[in-house]
Amino acid sequence: MMKLYDFLPCPFGQKVRIVLAEKSLTYELIQIDLAQGDQRRPEFLRLNPFARVPVLVDEDTTVYDSTVIIEYLEDEYPEPPVLPSVESSALRARARIFEDFADTSFTPQVGQLMAEMARAEGERDQGRLQRLHRSIERALDYLNHELTGQQFLAGDFSIADIGFAPRLLVLGELGLEAGLNRPNVDAWIKRMLERPSIQSLQGVTAEALAGV
C-alpha cells in the first residue's frame, strides 16, 4: 500500500489527497507534525532532504513535491485522469500553467493572509493586509475572466482546478468572498464542492486556519 507523509493543514498535501481520492487510490496516511519539527527527523529527511511535505512512497518509489507526485500518479494510475488528454497538448499546458499559478501566486498569498489574521487584532499590519487582499482579489478577478463560458479551467476537472481548491475553501473565514460579484468563480466553486474529493477537505479547514 502507498504511504503519504503529510501535514493535514498543508494545501500542497491537500492537492495530493484530492488526486488520490479522485483516482480512488488507497494509502496509509502518516502525519508529519510540522509544528513539532517532525520534518527534521533523520527518518523523514531520508525521504525528502528538503524537509517538506508531502512525500509519497509507492513500493520502491519515493516522490516529493506535490506537482511531481501528481504527475507520477497520473503516469502510474492514469484512470480517471486529472490532466487533459495527451491528444490535447494545449489544454495540458493550460492545466499545468494554472496549477503553477495556484502554487506560486495564490496559495502563498492566502497563506500569508492566514498568518497575519492569526495575530491579535491590534498587532496586525493593516498595510500588509490590504496588499494581500488586493493580490488575492486580482487573482480571483483573473480566474473569473478565464472561466468565462467554461465549467472548469482546462476542459474537464483537472489539476488546474485542484491547485486552487485548498485555499479557496478558507477564504470565507478570512473575510474574503471569492464568488462575490464573480459569477463564474461562484459557479466554479459550487461545481467543485459537489465532488466528494473536495468535500473531504472541508473538515480540515479549521485545522488549516489554526495551523498557520
What is each PLM-predicted segment?
Residues M1-Q130, N144:
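GST-like domain detector, emphasizing the conserved glutathione-binding G-site
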Residues L34-A35, V185, A206:
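Conserved beta-strand edge residues that scaffold enzyme active sites
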Residues G37-D38, E74, I189, L209-G211:
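Short secondary-structure boundary/hinge segments and terminal tails
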Residues V68, N184, S197, G203:
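Residue-level recognition of oxygen-bearing side chains
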Residues A90, A102-P196:
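GST-like fold's C-terminal all-alpha helical module
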Residues L201-V212:
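Terminal-tail/helix-coil boundary detector
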